Amino acid sequence: MIRLPLLKRPRRNRKSAAVRSIIQETQLCSSDLIWPIFLKDGSGIREEIKSMPGVYRWSLDMVSKELERLCTIGLKAVILFPVIDANKKEQFGSYASHPYNIVCKGIQAIKKSFPELCVISDIALDPFTTSGHDGIFHNNYVINDESVRVYGGIAVMHAEMGADIVAPSDMMDGRVKHIREQMDQMGFVNTGILSYSAKYASALYGPFRDALSSHLQSGDKRTYQMDPANVQEALLECQLDEEEGADMVMIKPAGFYLDVIVKARENTHLPVVAYQVSGEFSMIMAACLHGWLNKESVIKESLLAIKRAGATAIISYATPWVLEWLAKDALPFERSVL
């Protein structure tokens, strides 16, 4: 047998699963994951979203059953998105400020049944407006300051309902500062802010808009969401949000923007949350459903890459499956009787 005179053989550290596990640099844990939930008024609802295989719109009674199951296998956090009936939408998205909308009811119900679960509420107007824009849309433009004023009121209301963290996703200037001031004035000094700091004007949001039945009627979101070509701008947005009082920053999307996650991690001491968005998820699922990729392997790898880039936590539609896989992986090795 030929033996080369090699002093360095990196393969020695890959020779078995046990050896590989003790030197693994990045590990995916259940506490890394945040489950995004689409909530809908009604009962007995579990509607699969056609463009997002395996993802559902839920009524509160049905999602409570799923949460009970997922909490037993390690779920720590959820983020809530509302599916609003068309007859409740109008130009200004006023129903977003209604204390009995599905987000408010969802926060209250989930915190009552699962008090240890971290509940994050999305702050934006696009599910509630007829325009499909994230703010007040007038003369083909989203009005910044008036929209920010509305977000402050919504954030206070969500805090009153029991949200642990509010997450403004609108990309308006100054909204973190205004929300922090409004919540502090009302006594909600311990309610956190997860700011969508670098939210890109990506082509990957289509399935999400299908899920919410929220589509742009005119214009586009490039006047407030970020240019996919830019990274220094993302660092500026993260810096401004940190200065305004954000407790966490977010990069969205995640998989196409790993370089942004890396730089954000290098430039802030705040937690960096990454959002594996609907388009990323649906592309992976399309390949899996065609038999081209292994679902468990590719989803785990996609999330591991995001964490390796520097993400503290990851919002992913695959969270329920990943929790199951991680629970399975954690089972003890079978041992032979000595």
Curated annotation (Swiss-Prot):
Q: What class of enzyme is it?
A: lyase
- Keyword check for Lyase: yes
Gene3D superfamilies cross-referenced by the UniProt entry: Aldolase class I
User: Which residues hold 5-aminolevulinate 2?
Assistant: 278, 317
* Gene Ontology MF term list: porphobilinogen synthase activity; zinc ion binding
Q: Which CDD domains match?
A: ALAD_PBGS_aspartate_rich
| Record key words, sorted | Heme biosynthesis, Lyase, Magnesium, Metal-binding, Porphyrin biosynthesis
EC numbers: 4.2.1.24
Query: A Gene Ontology CC term for this entry?
Result: cytosol
Question: For binding 5-aminolevulinate 1, which residues are annotated in this chain's numbering?
Answer: 209, 221
Q: Which residues form the active site?
A: 199, 252
- Report whether Ligase shows up as a keyword of the record: no
Which SUPFAM superfamilies is this protein grouped with? Aldolase
Where Mg(2+) is bound, by residue?
237
Question: Pfam families, from UniProt?
Answer: ALAD (PF00490)
UniProt catalytic activity? 2 5-aminolevulinate = porphobilinogen + 2 H2O + H(+)
Which InterPro entries is this protein grouped with?
Answer: ALAD (IPR001731), ALAD_AS (IPR030656), Aldolase_TIM (IPR013785)
The protein's annotated pathway: Porphyrin-containing compound metabolism; protoporphyrin-IX biosynthesis; coproporphyrinogen-III from 5-aminolevulinate: step 1/4
Q: Indicate the quaternary assembly.
A: Homooctamer.
Protein function: Catalyzes an early step in the biosynthesis of tetrapyrroles. Binds two molecules of 5-aminolevulinate per subunit, each at a distinct site, and catalyzes their condensation to form porphobilinogen.
Task: Please state which protein family the record places this protein in.
Answer: Belongs to the ALAD family.
**Which NCBIfam families would you find in this protein's record?**
PRK09283.1
Q: What is this protein called?
A: Delta-aminolevulinic acid dehydratase
Taxonomically, what lineage is the organism?
A: Bacteria, Pseudomonadati, Chlamydiota, Chlamydiia, Chlamydiales
